[in-house]
A protein has these predicted regions:
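Conserved catalytic cores of ATP-dependent inositol ring kinases
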Residues: 1-366
Length: 366
């Protein structure tokens, strides 16, 4: 067992109800020097459903790009909206959206007993272990957009009020976290926040179901610390093992306030501080790397008028190139949907969005 990370390493069968025999199960990349990178853990999206249907312009919001609908009616074959009562849905069978790195082996590596990377093998090897804190059967429910009983709005022709459409994508997927990395001589463990100890993550919540809504009972985890041990000490002393080095992380939720997947009044998980300790000596805590961010929005009372670098969440806050664009700068109070063009009076403020992080003056040298 991991003396720091209480989560168990998960063993996953190569063939399950959704991991089919004909699916790719492992990818190996061979480098020019003979070293092999083994991506042996396929991470699955088990459900993906894309739905579009006729929608009512009267309950659409052009500013947010969302339209309300009646679940069980509008998003079914019983749709009666618009001129064509359109409803369409496409479901994609389970597929691997990522392959996680499970091992790096040298050109002369030999698996002595055929049981994967172990200490009795010949050659150099690094093994990556993963965990699923919520168990093998847990699937994270995701949806775009996340808002309950709302869909992404497509206005169609402005002169035709009967051709408006709504759409959403819903799915379920596996969630894996890195548990530990080990070589023959060293091991690094990755400790996640523990909700049972009140260490709650307040963003990245999932969806209640296909019709959306933030499910605050479905939180993800964040990385709390990384501990590096001598493997001999780790194996011999278990919980009494002393880490050679520990990396600590501290967060808040000050960026992207108002994102629907966060708790009320919170933004996205934001890295604020990193510090290192050695052999459980806490002196390094006095010399952390501190990350500072500009105030959130020039239009919010009390914020710095010269530092509007980090605005709140805006689902339509982008131009036709995908770059951030505040619709309040558009002529005649037009929305970005109606005026998707890049503003020609750009300034340093617009160019600096999300790049305003800087190290605090008192941070220690790297």
């Amino acid at each position: 067992p991991n003396p720091v990370n209480s989560e168990a390493i998960i063993a996953e069968s190569r063939v399950t109800s959704f991991r089919k025999k004909h699916h790719l199960s492992e990818i190996t990349v061979l480098n020019a020097d003979g070293r092999r990178y083994v991506y042996g853990l396929p991470v699955y999206n088990t459900i993906q459903k894309e739905v579009s249907f006729s929608a009512d312009k009267a309950v659409a919001d052009i500013q947010t790009g969302l339209v309300e609908y009646t679940p069980g009616t509008d998003n079914t074959i019983r749709n009666t909206k618009g001129k064509d009562n359109f409803y369409g849905a496409e479901e994609i069978p389970a597929y691997a959206h990522s392959f996680l790195l499970t091992g790096i082996v040298s050109a002369d590596y030999t698996d002595k007993t055929g049981d994967g990377i172990t200490d009795d093998d010949m050659g150099d090897a690094v093994k990556f272990n993963y965990c699923r804190p919520y168990g093998n059967n847990y699937m994270f429910r995701w949806r775009t957009p996340l808002a309950e009983n709302k869909a992404t709005y497509s206005e169609g022709l402005k002169t035709d009020y009967s051709d408006d459409k709504g759409s959403y994508i819903y799915g379920q997927k596996e969630i894996w976290y890195l548990h530990s990395i080990e070589s023959k001589s060293m091991i690094a463990t990755f400790t996640l926040n523990d909700p049972q100890r009140g260490e709650l993550r307040e963003d990245a919540f999932g969806s209640k179901g296909e019709n959306g809504g933030t499910d605050m009972q479905q939180p993800l985890r964040y990385l709390k610390q990384i501990d590096v041990y001598s493997k001999a000490d780790y194996v011999k002393n278990k919980e009494a093992a002393k880490p050679v080095k520990t990396v600590h992380f501290e967060y808040n939720y000050e960026l992207c306030l108002g994102v629907p997947s966060s708790a009320p009044g919170k933004g996205k998980l934001t890295l604020k501080k990193i510090w290192f300790t050695y052999n459980k000596n806490n002196k390094g805590q006095k010399k952390p790397y501190v990350f500072l961010y500009h105030p959130k929005d020039i239009n919010d009372p009390g914020s710095d008028p010269k530092a509007a670098y980090n605005p709140g969440y805006d689902p339509k806050g982008f131009d036709r190139w995908g770059n951030y664009k505040d619709a309040r700068n558009n002529p005649a109070q037009m929305s970005n949907a109606d005026y998707p063009y890049t503003l020609q009076n750009g300034n340093e403020t617009n160019n600096g969005k999300w790049d305003s992080t800087k190290a605090a003056m008192h941070a220690a040298a790297w």
